[in-house]
Every structure is written in structure tokens, then in C-alpha cells.
A protein has these predicted regions:
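ATP-binding/phosphotransfer module of carbohydrate and carboxylate kinases, centering on a glycine-rich
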Residues: 2-98, 106-128, 252-399
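Short glycine-aspartate micro-motif
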Residues: 62-64, 72-76, 132-136, 202-206, ...
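Short, acidic Gly/Pro/Ser/Thr-rich loop/turn segments
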Residues: 80-82, 142-144, 212
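Detector for glycine-centered tight turns/loop "hinges" at secondary-structure junctions
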Residues: 91-92, 147-149, 219, 227
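Glycine-rich phosphate-binding loop and adjoining helix at the ATP-binding site
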Residues: 93-96, 100-201, 332-343
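Glycine/GP-enriched mid-protein hinge/lid loop-to-helix segment characteristic of carbohydrate kinases
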Residues: 96-98, 105-110, 160-287, 399
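Short glycine-rich anion-binding loops that position phosphate/pyrophosphate groups of nucleotides
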Residues: 140-143, 209-210, 327-328
């Protein structure tokens, strides 16, 4: 119900009755509870001046999300966009802070650094911690959100951490925590707040140093048996004088990503991915992207990605494929992928699948993940917010 109100501000109680099959009494009770908890608010709908006869009686009342009703916090762990952030109930970013991190090798130290930064950001805003639904963590790792563990990260060199990252963030913030692979976090964010709204089947390709995919089918993430779905970076491509984390020399990770672009431009003094060089990769790639003289090299990397997009489109038949990330959403990269899909694989505007650039940045995805998980789902802790609102009312009565 909250999802409907968020997606359609101004929806009436009668419309909710019809959509969800509620009785008028049930809809009134639910709306009253949400209003009392401060999560939604009522407002007078504007008069429809196109009708010949004016409506007589009480103004029509609509429901909308109270943007200050709840908040969500996020932690994005990346060499490119290391940030902590806060968004309101409509997904609007209201505060963020970059986190300077030069090493990601120790799981607990990394979690402590980011969660402490987030706690300070929350304190700086002055927002009551009781109004936060939770914390979303987006990072390059294989995750099992239901078990709250980071299982493996080739990118950071993490093994099964037995929940240490989750424990550290929860301990330092006191809030519910959801950890998710960055491609999946972006996919969920685009589905609710971005270009994939109202689309039930799509794929999102996140491209930065390496590439990964978040797949959504019937509005649910596809994780695979062991949570390994989406490893497009290991699709076979052209041979390169480089070596992937998996040991091969023909992965898309070496030709369609930032690592491949940096190597081709002579920015690397090594041919095998080195996780201790993550900050260098990020700084160098951002500089390359910012120089228009490199547009053709970036476009070529996008063309290489098309080799992976074609079989993915044929196998999954998504309505939309989103290219995201600092490299993936770059104009030259996107154009290269789009043109190669048309030239070599016959895709056009009449094809069943369309390509689009992502609207949500990785730095936004973490807090939007928390909002999606802990507000617009059955995991909303309504009683906590209802009690918080009641306590505020009691305080006002004695003020």
C-alpha cells in the first residue's frame, strides 16, 4: 500500500479500496494508522477545471508520502564513490559525506570506518535516529542478504566474514542493516525510483573497474543457486595481454571495463588486477573519462560489452537493459554499446529489448536500498514508528 501511495501521490482511499480489495472501514483504519505514525499525509486535491460542472461538497482528499516521515541511510563501499548518505521517504538525497579510504582489505576496519562516518552524518543532520528505517550497504561482493553476510569479494579480497561487516554497522548505528551487491542495489533502486519504474523484467549492467549484472524477473532479484548470478564480466571475449581475477585472459572484464581501458591507454604497469591498486584505478579512470580525447577508447569498450549484452538479451528477454556506473552510464560508452548492438546483432527501436542509461548513481543506491527494503516492503517496522510518533505527541503536550 505504501508503494502505491509513493508511486501515485494523491491516490484516494477509495482508489486504494478498489486496488487492494479492502473494505472502506479497513482502508480508513490503515490510512488513519499511517497518518498517526507520520508516514503519510493528507492534502486537498486540486479542482479539475476541465469538467463542465463544479464539484459540490468537501474537497477531494488525497494521500501522499510524508517526506519527513521516515529516512534511510546508506553506505557505499567503493574506490570510486566511497560515501555515506541519507535520503528522505521519497528517495531524495538530503545529506552525504565522502569517506576517505585507502585500503579495503580488512573487513572489520572497513565497516567501522564507514559506519562511524554514517553515525556522525546522522548526528550532524539532527534527525531523530528513531525515524530511520535502516541502513543499506552497497558494495562489490557476493552477498546473502537473508543471512546478513558478505560471502566473497574478488574485488576486495574478502572471504566469508561470518557477518562481521553487518555486526559492525549494526553495532555502530543501532539500526537494521541490509547488505547488497552494488549491481543488485542499483537494480532495486532503478526499479522503484529510476528508469525501470513499472517494469517487472529488466537487467542492469554496472561497469566501472569491472562489470557485474543485477537481474530482475517479475519484480524480484535473480540470485542463482549460490548467489553467483550476474557475472557478465567473466563472459568470453577477445584475448588481451591481461589476466582476470579468475585467471583467464579473454574475459569481458579485460576489454569492456575500466581495467581494460586503463591498460589500453598505457596507464598500468602490471597486467593482472591488483586490489591494492583500487584507489589508483578509480582516480585514473575518472581522469580518463573526464578527458574528451579518450572518447573513442571509451566507445570501443562499450562496443565490446555488446558481445555480452546480446546473449543476455536472448536468454533473459528483459524489457530493458540499463547501463550504470561511472563507465557504464558514460555517454560515449553507452553509444558504443548501442551502436554495436545495432550493427552486429540487429537490435533497433522495434526490438523487444531496449537499452537505457541509469538514472541512479551508485552513491545514491545504498540509502535507496534501505528505503526499498525497510520501508516499501513487508519489513517495515510500523510499531517502532508509531511509537516514535506517539512519544513526539506526548512531548508536545508537555512543551
Amino acid at each position: 500500500m505504501l508503494s502505491r501511495i509513493q508511486a501515485q501521490p494523491g491516490v484516494s482511499r477509495a482508489e486504494l479500496n478498489r486496488s487492494f480489495g479492502f473494505s472502506e472501514m479497513a482502508a480508513t483504519r490503515i490510512a488513519r494508522d499511517l497518518l498517526a505514525a507520520g508516514i503519510v499525509e493528507e492534502f486537498d486535491l486540486p479542482e479539475d477545471n476541465t469538467k463542465k460542472t463544479r464539484r459540490i461538497g468537501r474537497p477531494r482528499i488525497g494521500l501522499r508520502i510524508n517526506p519527513k516521515g521516515v529516512y534511510a541511510a546508506g553506505i557505499t563501499v567503493s574506490a570510486y564513490y566511497s560515501e555515506v548518505s541519507i535520503c528522505d521517504a521519497n528517495g531524495k538525497m538530503i545529506a552525504c559525506k565522502k569517506v576517505n579510504n585507502t585500503s579495503f582489505e580488512d573487513v572489520v576496519q572497513t565497516a567501522r570506518l564507514y559506519s562511524n562516518a554514517l553515525r556522525k552524518l546522522i548526528q550532524k543532520t539532527g534527525i531523530d535516529i528513531a525515524r530511520f528505517v535502516g541502513v543499506g550497504v552497497a558494495l562489490s561482493a557476493k552477498t546473502t542478504p537473508g543471512q546478513n553476510r558478505n560471502v566473497r569479494s574478488e574485488y576486495f579480497g574478502w572471504l566469508n566474514d561470518q557477518g562481521q561487516f553487518w555486526d559492525e554497522v549494526q553495532k555502530n548505528t543501532g539500526l537494521p542493516v541490509e547488505i547488497e551487491n552494488i549491481a543488485n542495489a542499483l537494480a532495486l533502486s532503478e526499479m522503484r525510483f529510476g528508469v525501470a519504474r513499472d517494469i517487472s523484467d529488466f537487467a542492469l549492467v554496472h561497469v566501472a573497474t569491472f562489470a557485474g549484472v543485477g537481474v530482475v524477473s517479475e519484480n524480484r532479484l535473480v540470485r542463482g543457486t549460490a548467489g553467483d548470478a550476474g557475472r557478465i564480466g567473466h563472459f568470453r571475449s577477445v584475448e588481451r595481454p591481461l589476466r582476470c581475477t579468475c585467471g583467464r585472459t579473454d574475459c569481458l572484464n579485460l576489454s569492456a571495463t575500466g581495467f581494460g581501458v586503463l591498460a589500453k591507454l598505457g596507464k598500468l604497469d602490471h597486467d593482472t588486477f591488483d586490489r591494492t591498486q583500487l584507489p589508483f584505478y578509480a582516480k585514473s579512470l575518472l581522469a580518463v573519462i573526464g578527458d574528451k580525447a579518450n572518447a573513442e577508447h571509451i566507445r570501443e569498450a562499450g562496443e565490446h560489452l555488446a558481445v555480452g549484452l546480446d546473449p543476455m538479451a536472448k536468454l533473459l528477454a528483459p524489457k530493458l537493459i540499463i547501463l550504470s556506473g561511472y563507465l557504464g552510464a558514460n555517454d560515449a560508452y553507452f553509444e558504443g554499446a548501442l551502436q554495436e548492438m545495432a550493427a552486429s546483432f540487429g537490435y533497433d527501436q522495434n526490438s523487444g529489448v531496449q537499452l537505457a542509461q541509469g538514472a541512479v548513481s551508485p552513491s545514491e543506491a545504498a540509502s535507496l536500498l534501505a528505503l526499498h527494503t525497510f520501508c516499501y516492503s513487508d519489513r517495515l517496522d510500523f510499531e517502532r514508528f508509531n511509537q516514535s510518533a506517539a512519544n513526539d505527541d506526548e512531548g508536545s503536550a508537555y512543551a
